[in-house]
Design a protein with these regions (language model features):
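Conserved donor-binding/catalytic core segment of Leloir-type glycosyltransferases
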Residues: 4, 168, 207-225, 231-235
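Nucleotide-activated donor-binding/catalytic signature segment of Leloir-type glycosyltransferases, i.e.
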Residues: 256-275
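Carbohydrate-associated surface elements
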Residues: 173, 194
Length: 382
């Protein structure tokens, strides 16, 4: 099959899940490429806005061809930026098919706006499209306001869902959560994100031998990630006399504002790359995430794949609640989180079993085979 992946956002703003699925499908022998237009924001990263290429180009990442462009977004002009982005992707697709021919299927990551442009391309070229949905309810609320909402974007995205051959939420719970905006009149089935389980493989942790129990957290500095809960929870545990450390990484965690929140035993590194995330996990005894809203956070999968247990809040999906591998606490519960962290210190962990559980449903082989079969079935019905 010839499969074209279209992410709504990509490097330098995340979207690695698109690359991982492309790699999984390519490893099964399919022709897979990524078409990516990234809208840059001057307030998000001025250096990227000014210095990233101004022309379209192809490059390779992990043996996957990416047809890339960057759009300079204009502040406070959301509608203009969206329609310009859609126009650029449509133009890039014209270039793409001149070189590679029409794909058999389009795979959009997030309805906003890759799913919408996939719908437009489907109408123009007679191609089926599938949407994998990653965005959380809280991220939609930040843009549309709480439901019911009359935001102009909603009818466009609702139509993209309804006309898709299939919508693949990365958590079953997401369908009900976002129904307040888009309803449920579309075809869907749950499919996990992919993580590179060969890269994030099991690794035996050294004996503590009196060293501190090391928690880590890999999350950007934002309200949604709950650092205002995690930091005081850790302080309570540390002040009680527990021999613990907390190592933090993520965009914005190296700023003066964030580091002023830290206390004894806490360290933050800012944004780190994939290899550094793995090293941090290998050097840690458990991962903790105090999020207020999530769909399927990849870092939980990555942590458990390496063999460490996780502590997370009740917003994470059932699919990530691995027996023996995850402890769930209420959202915004500082005391509950601190107690769970304390209990984790003395907990026996079957690390290999946790790792194998993740490989079973989130490995490239497992997800790639399910995706490929779904795509074949859709194409056969055209």
């Amino acid at each position: 099959m010839h499969i074209l992946e279209i992410p709504s956002f990509f490097t330098p703003y995340g979207g690695e899940f698109c690359l991982e699925q492309a790699k999984a499908l390519k490893a099964l022998g399919h022709e897979v490429r990524i078409l990516s237009c990234v809208q840059l924001g001057v307030t998000i990263g001025l250096k990227d806005y000014l210095l990233l290429p101004y022309h379209r180009y192809e490059h390779q990442r992990d043996d996957v061809t990416i047809y890339q462009s960057f759009q300079r977004g204009l502040p406070k002009m959301v509608h203009h930026n969206v329609m310009r982005w859609v126009s650029i992707v449509e133009s890039m697709f014209c270039d793409y098919i001149k070189k590679y021919g029409k794909p058999d299927i389009l795979h959009a990551h997030c309805a906003k706006w890759a799913g919408y442009v996939a719908m437009q391309l489907s109408k123009a070229y007679g191609l089926p499209y599938v949407i994998t949905e990653h965005l959380s309810l809280m991220s939609l609320e930040e843009e549309f306001g709480k439901a019911p909402s009359d935001a102009w974007q909603i009818p466009f995205l609702k139509q993209a869902y309804e006309q898709a051959a299939m919508v693949l939420p990365v958590a079953e719970e997401l369908v009900e959560e976002i129904a307040c905006y888009f309803g449920k009149e579309y075809r869907w089935q749950y499919l996990s994100n992919v993580i590179d389980t060969d890269f994030f493989h099991y690794h035996k942790r050294p004996s503590r031998n009196g060293r501190p129990f090391r928690f880590c957290c890999v999350a950007d500095y934002s309200y949604r990630k709950g650092y205002d809960v995690l930091i005081p929870a850790y302080k309570q545990l540390h002040d009680s006399g527990a021999n613990v450390e907390l190592i933090i990484a993520g965009r914005g965690t190296d700023t003066v504002k964030f580091r002023n929140l830290l206390s004894e035993g806490m360290t933050s590194y800012g944004l780190i790359d994939k290899a550094a995330v793995r090293e941090l996990l290998y050097e840690s005894d458990a991962l903790v995430l105090a999020s207020r809203s999530e769909v399927q956070p990849l870092v939980l999968l990555e942590a458990m794949a390496t063999g460490i247990p996780v502590i997370a809040t009740s917003c994470i999906p059932q699919s990530l609640r691995i027996e023996g591998g995850s402890t769930i606490v209420p959202i915004d519960d500082i005391k509950g989180l601190s107690l769970a962290m304390g209990q984790m210190i003395g907990q026996d962990t079957d690390s290999k079993t946790i790792s194998e559980s993740i490989r079973h449903f989130a490995s490239p082989e497992a997800v790639g085979m399910k995706l490929a079969q779904l795509f074949r079935d859709i194409i056969a019905l055209r």
